[in-house]
């Protein structure tokens, strides 16, 4: 008769994640591709439990935020994924974004899901219940305005300018528009000859100061 058969019993779903640093941070001004990885994982018990033979499929879903989350990319296959060298059963992937997924002022929710190679149809990760990654896509520069000193003002020894004041606002503003916010404001001061470098007008090169 036939000899013994060895097989792996695997009912554990794989896991997937996004690896773009800017997506994890939450604010993006350029996103030509979304990158990530999926791993066929072994169950935690019993000790020494095995896993099936890697990843068979990875999908991504992107939603945009209006009054509520609205799916703009239904679950769709990513491209360029395969098992990494060394038999790690970790597959990397990339997804090329399109115009509706990169509109400045929009907030997006990115989710991934994967399927492993267990027979007959693979264990599927439940992507719908994942928290995902929320990002704000912002390519508009902020607006700023100097409050004091006033434009074309004339100031002398009896009215010295010791403090500069200004406002900065992330742009555009409005209902349903999301922005990254102001990270920092810088100023440069020029006396028609040199730039202020912190202790005098000593720099012929442009100097921006925090």
Q: Where are these predicted regions, by residue range?
A:
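Low-complexity, disordered linker/stalk regions enriched in Pro/Thr/Ser/Gly
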Residues: 1-210
């Amino acid at each position: 008769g036939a000899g013994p058969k060895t097989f792996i019993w695997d009912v554990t779903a794989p896991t997937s994640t996004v690896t773009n640093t800017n997506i994890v941070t939450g604010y993006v001004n350029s996103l030509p591709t979304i990158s990530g990885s999926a791993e066929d994982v072994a169950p935690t018990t019993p000790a020494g439990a095995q896993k099936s033979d890697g990843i068979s499929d990875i999908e991504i879903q992107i939603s945009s935020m209006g009054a509520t989350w609205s799916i703009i990319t239904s679950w769709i296959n990513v491209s360029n994924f395969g098992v990494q060298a060394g038999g790690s059963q970790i597959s990397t992937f990339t997804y090329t974004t399109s115009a509706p997924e990169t509109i400045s002022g929009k907030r997006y929710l990115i989710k991934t899901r994967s399927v492993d190679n267990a027979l007959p149809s693979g264990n599927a990760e439940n992507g719908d219940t994942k928290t995902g990654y929320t990002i704000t896509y912002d390519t508009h520069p902020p607006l700023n305005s100097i409050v004091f000193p006033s434009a074309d003002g004339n100031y002398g020894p009896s009215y010295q300018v010791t403090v500069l004041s200004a406002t900065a606002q992330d742009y555009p503003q409005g209902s349903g528009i999301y922005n990254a916010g102001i990270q920092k404001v810088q100023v440069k001061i020029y006396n028609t000859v040199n730039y202020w470098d912190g202790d005098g007008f000593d720099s012929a090169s442009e100097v921006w100061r925090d």
